[in-house]
Amino acid sequence: MALQKVDISLSTEQLLQAQVHVWNHMYAFANSMSLKCAIQLGIPDILHKHGRPMTLSQLLQSIPINKEKTQCFQRLMRALVNSNFFIEENNSNNQEVCYWLTPASCLLLKEAPLTVTPLVQVVLDPTFTNPWHHMSEWFTHEKHATQFEAANGCTFWEKLANEPSKGRFFDEAMSCDSRLIAHVFTKDYKHVIEGIRTLVDVGGGNGTMAKAIVEAMPTIKCTVIDLPHVVAGLESTDNLNYIGGDMFQSIPSADAILLKSIIHDWDDVEGLKILKKCKDAVVMGGKVIIIDVVVGVNHDIDEVLEDQLHFDMAMMCYFNAKERTMSEWEKLIYDAGFKSYKLTPAFGVRSLIEAYP
């Protein structure tokens, strides 16, 4: 029996719009690489140090651009303006356009307290971009558990453990992310931890989040538990303690257990194990505080849903893990034995979940 042809005839307008859509996604990486270049050239920092908008000529005097490529630099700036990393302003003294920072590029200032530059540099490093080229191979072969393993010959965590420089690179990226989240958490959601005496930050790295919590609320005693090589050499204080351990084996008891961007690194089987360990560690009347993506929450905010889906694909790429919808979170929470939970759309792309045993 002959296959019936499907009519996919398009009007000229539909045809050209379809081409635009394909091309837009085909070259989407150009935005990422232009962003990476802006950071490497230090453009945001140069503008910030200057203290006011700069003309192209002024920027070129501050950056060692090859003279033959000055016109190309103008095109880079045009692309970055289009991506809303810089704005153009008219220069009243002459006709040359001036460039200035946007809220997004303020997050790219290397010395800014809430900089996200280390995270951008990690995500766009070849070690972490190469695995994306193995997606179709990973889907069709059983050999590798993850795309990351297909590209690097080892798991994500093995790579960081075997190459200390990569490990430090990644830890700083996580720290910068924690600084931003901690800033919002202690500023706008301090009530979530009011009345809590003890808190354990599971997988808390070098303690960036915990430090912010004890600084904002000195009466809380925080413990950070992470792998021994992560916390090695970190000094404890009166209200901040570091423990080298394994969250799959044991978690210290506390009034509250914090999981910031932890469960999304794991599939449902491992995620359930972690949540059960956290539930067992919470004292009576306590709770588990989860800061993670809930796919679909805040979807009406510009770019949020797309970011959530990007995160989900990244978790699949690196760990064969995932970001979860609210129904998936709910199942995981109840399967772990929690009786109730509260969801707060608190952090843009991410949400705050309080789970109660």
UniProtKB/Swiss-Prot annotation:
Gene Ontology molecular function terms on file: (iso)eugenol O-methyltransferase activity; protein dimerization activity
Residues annotated as catalytic: H264 (proton acceptor)
EC number: 2.1.1.146
Chain residues that bind S-adenosyl-L-methionine: G203, D226, D246, M247, K260
Protein name: Eugenol O-methyltransferase
Species of the source: Ocimum basilicum (Sweet basil)
Keywords: Methyltransferase, S-adenosyl-L-methionine, Transferase
Gene Ontology process terms (BP): methylation; phenylpropanoid biosynthetic process
Family to which this protein belongs: Belongs to the class I-like SAM-binding methyltransferase superfamily. Cation-independent O-methyltransferase family. COMT subfamily.
Catalyzed chemical reaction(s): (E)-isoeugenol + S-adenosyl-L-methionine = (E)-isomethyleugenol + S-adenosyl-L-homocysteine + H(+)
Function: Phenylpropene O-methyltransferase that catalyzes the methylation of the para-4-hydroxyl of eugenol to methyleugenol. Can also convert chavicol to methylchavicol but with less affinity.
Tissue occurrence: Specifically expressed in the peltate glandular trichomes on the surface of the young basil leaves.
Domain of life: Eukaryota
Associated pathway: Aromatic compound metabolism; phenylpropanoid biosynthesis
